[in-house]
Regions:
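Charge-rich alpha-helical segments
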Residues: 1-65
Length: 65
């Protein structure tokens, strides 16, 4: 999923919220910053080589932020 922000500070604050959720779940997304104000989040369980329930749960938490 892609997110756009007005400032880098807003992006960083949102990324910190995602990191906090990810740490609580011990399940971490791939995050890429594009053009300083765009954040791309990818959820995939690499050791299972598929999208799992944990990915869906983390996606729900991210969507609720």
């Amino acid at each position: 999923k892609n997110f756009k922000f007005k400032t880098q500070t807003e992006l960083a604050q949102f990324l910190l919220k995602i990191a906090t959720c990810a740490d609580e779940m011990n399940h971490h997304p791939d995050c890429k910053i594009h053009k300083a104000f765009q954040l791309e989040i990818t959820l995939f369980t690499h050791d299972k080589n598929e999208i799992t329930d944990l990915d869906h749960q983390l996606a729900e938490k991210i969507n609720s932020l």
